[in-house]
């Protein structure tokens, strides 16, 4: 197959503050599926990932651990790479921002921008969020806290260098308007335009003097380069960009990037800071930045203190690498956050991998051996049902390609499994076990099994980008090779008279939840114990972490009649999207799925939950409350909360997994 041209793609480089959990790992698996499919299509792919290793947060963690920052990041970077390799990701380059060649170019880039007049020296007095490595103004805070992570900010005053962001703001606005594909999904573009660009950009602080773990400004070494200027430039430095004009052939071939794949929480840095830095360097902008959603544990962010963190290596130990890849790829929608729970992982494993796929392959090979000693041969004895199967199979490639073109990877893998579902239906329609009882139907039986083997072969080739090891195992059992992309819309290329394996292996053995849940509980307890040991070592955790909470009494309200109570309708709802209400510091506006309907509900809980934390939660809803407007926004119900003596609120959620729409009685 001739090359369709270059395709340079990157992930965000993982911040080396700790071991990446499954939510972090999702990004590299998503990127790998895209890279593999682009290669399959015929693109010359260069896929880069790596680690972001500088900053105040890392320096503080290293000091607490009693080691140097370099020792600290060496350990974490090694762990990140181990997990990326465990997940069978096909990156071409793993970068580290402590690499000498990167540090050399960052210094040259900083000097070039300074000489150009885009960076100038001044002093900074403002508010700084250490975990996010971000400066904020008072007006940008949400309830006095960092708008990105909700943590406390600290006053900071120091001499600093600044970048003239406002100089390029209009140019960037015009670029975004003229290139609607640049920021995806569209909701991310709207957020950047309305919240940052249109209100006006302030100059950006691009150096620090209050810590030392960073790349020094070579002409003023008491300053270190702002972590985001350092980190973002890896996309060009690590493919050979040279600020002096001596860039490598690799850079000249691959820049601009075709895709930056990042988490939605860092979209601002990649769609405002990064393109403006590139404009200042007179470099073309990346073709697309995709801000993917988050993978949440049961609707909540993962936290070791809660024992709810899920790590990729734990999942791989329990379910296998490809099962882990399948889950994170299948469960992540295009725009909204995905939900992961151990129960859901087991359900998907059994229903999709063990039943739909594994059982199909095993049955087909077993019947081929039972009825024809494993020989697969087309006899030409066809029926109408064959044409429908072939239509589904030969159209699958283009359906998958269309989904992948638009980065709808979950939909793409669903299309592949739709092919396998159609094969299972074909078995039910043709009933090979019935045909086997009739000697006159022997040729028809052979044709049915040939059609199944051919269909599964094509399906396995399409599965290769998503579950590479499983695809190889299927093809090996069918005694078939990987096909060229251009042949995946053709039916009948399986070699006539070929022989499948006489010893089919089980791809995915069905799981018994009763047997595996104790293993999962052990993982949870180990996480909690590890967290408590870490915190006690740092002096940050009391002897017990159990929440006690004293009982409180509240003023009694008048009794009501039972009939009055029965007028109220309570149901379980699932929050599918949430955003802050403009011009309000207290209100959140949620779209809540209740059965088959979606209601918009405004709640005064912004102090206690971020919009991101809300998405995916199962909540208790008063659904028949008369609609009313709060701060000018229509609210069609009420979310039930509990309130303690200090007025703190907590959402009421079902104790056990309940479907959206379940009645509360």
Predicted regions and their residues:
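Phosphate-backbone binding interfaces of nucleic-acid-interacting proteins
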Residues: 542-665
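Intrinsic disorder at enzyme termini
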Residues: 474-564
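Secondary-structure transition/capping motifs at alpha-helix termini
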Residues: 1-3, 36-44, 64-65, 69, ...
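Structured secondary-structure scaffolds
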Residues: 2-49, 101-105, 149, 155-370, ...
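Helix-rich, typically C-terminal accessory recognition domains appended to large enzymatic cores
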Residues: 121, 343-381, 392-500, 622
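Cys/His-rich short segments
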Residues: 116-169, 173
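A glycine-rich helix N-cap at a beta->alpha junction
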Residues: 78-92
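N-terminal catalytic cores of NTP/NDP-binding nucleotidyl/phosphoryl-transfer enzymes
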Residues: 2-76, 95-110, 115, 132, ...
């Amino acid at each position: 197959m001739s090359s369709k041209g270059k395709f340079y793609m990157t992930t965000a480089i993982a911040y080396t503050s700790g071991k990446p959990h499954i939510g972090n790992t999702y990004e590299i698996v998503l990127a790998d599926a895209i890279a593999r499919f682009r290669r399959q299509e015929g693109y010359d792919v260069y896929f880069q990932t790596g680690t972001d290793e500088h900053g105040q947060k890392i320096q503080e963690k290293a000091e607490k651990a009693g080691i140097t920052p370099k020792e600290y990041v060496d350990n974490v970077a090694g762990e990140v790479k181990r997990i990326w390799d465990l997940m069978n990701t096909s990156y071409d380059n793993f970068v580290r921002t402590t690499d000498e060649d990167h540090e050399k170019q960052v210094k040259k880039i900083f000097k070039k921008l300074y000489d150009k007049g885009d960076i100038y020296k001044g002093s900074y007095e403002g508010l700084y969020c250490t975990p996010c490595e971000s400066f904020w103004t008072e007006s940008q805070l949400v309830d006095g806290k960092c708008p990105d992570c909700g943590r406390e900010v600290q006053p900071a005053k120091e001499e600093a260098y600044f970048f003239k962001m406002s100089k390029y703001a209009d140019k960037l606005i015009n670029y975004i308007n003229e290139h609607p594909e640049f920021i995806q999904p569209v909701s991310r573009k709207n957020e950047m335009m309305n919240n940052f660009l249109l209100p006006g950009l302030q100059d950006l602080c691009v150096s620090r003097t209050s810590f030392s773990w960073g790349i020094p400004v070579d002409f003023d070494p008491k300053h270190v380069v702002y972590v985001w200027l350092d980190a973002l430039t890896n996309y060009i430095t690590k493919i050979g960009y040279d600020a002096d004009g001596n860039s490598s052939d690799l850079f000249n071939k691959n820049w601009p990037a075709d895709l930056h794949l990042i988490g939605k929480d860092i979209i601002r840095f990649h769609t405002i800071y990064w393109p403006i830095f590139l404009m200042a360097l007179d470099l073309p902008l990346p073709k697309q930045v995709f801000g993917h959603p988050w993978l949440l544990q049961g609707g909540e962010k993962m936290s070791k203190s809660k024992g709810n963190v899920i790590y990729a290596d734990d999942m791989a130990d329990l379910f296998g690498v490809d099962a882990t890849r399948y889950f994170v790829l299948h469960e992540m929608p295009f725009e909204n956050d995905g939900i992961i729970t151990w129960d859901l992982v087991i359900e998907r494993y059994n229903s999709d991998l063990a039943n739909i796929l594994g059982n199909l392959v095993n049955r087909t090979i077993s019947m081929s051996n039972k009825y024809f000693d494993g020989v697969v041969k087309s006899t030409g004895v066809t029926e109408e049902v064959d044409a429908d199967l072939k239509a589904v199979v030969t159209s699958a490639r283009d359906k998958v390609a269309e989904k992948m073109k638009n980065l709808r990877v979950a939909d793409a893998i669903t299309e592949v499994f739709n092919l396998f579902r159609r094969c299972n239906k074909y078995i039910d329609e043709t009933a090979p076990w019935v045909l086997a009882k009739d000697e006159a139907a022997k040729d028809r039986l052979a044709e049915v099994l040939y059609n199944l083997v051919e269909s599964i072969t094509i399906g396995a080739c399409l599965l290769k980008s998503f579950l590479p090891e499983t695809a190889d195992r299927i093809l090996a059992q069918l005694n078939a090779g990987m096909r060229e992309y251009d042949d995946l819309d053709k039916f009948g290329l399986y070699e006539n008279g070929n022989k499948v394996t006489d010893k089919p292996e089980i791809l995915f053995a069905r799981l018994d939840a009763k047997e595996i849940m104790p293993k999962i509980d052990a993982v949870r307890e180990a996480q909690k114990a590890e967290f408590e040991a870490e915190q006690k070592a740092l002096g940050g955790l009391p002897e017990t972490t159990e929440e006690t909470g004293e009982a409180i009494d509240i003023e009694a309200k008048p009794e009501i009649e039972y009939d009055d109570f029965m007028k109220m309708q309570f149901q379980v709802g699932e929050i599918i999207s949430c955003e802050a209400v403009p011009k309000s510091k207290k209100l959140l506006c949620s779209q809540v799925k209740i059965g088959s309907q979606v209601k918009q509900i405004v709640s005064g809980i912004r102090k206690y939950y971020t919009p991101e934390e809300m998405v995916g939660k199962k909540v208790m809803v008063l659904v028949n409350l008369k609609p009313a407007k709060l701060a000018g926004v229509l609210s069609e119900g009420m979310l039930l909360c509990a309130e303690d003596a200090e007025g703190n609120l907590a959402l009421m959620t079902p104790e056990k997994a309940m479907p959206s729409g379940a009645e509360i009685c």
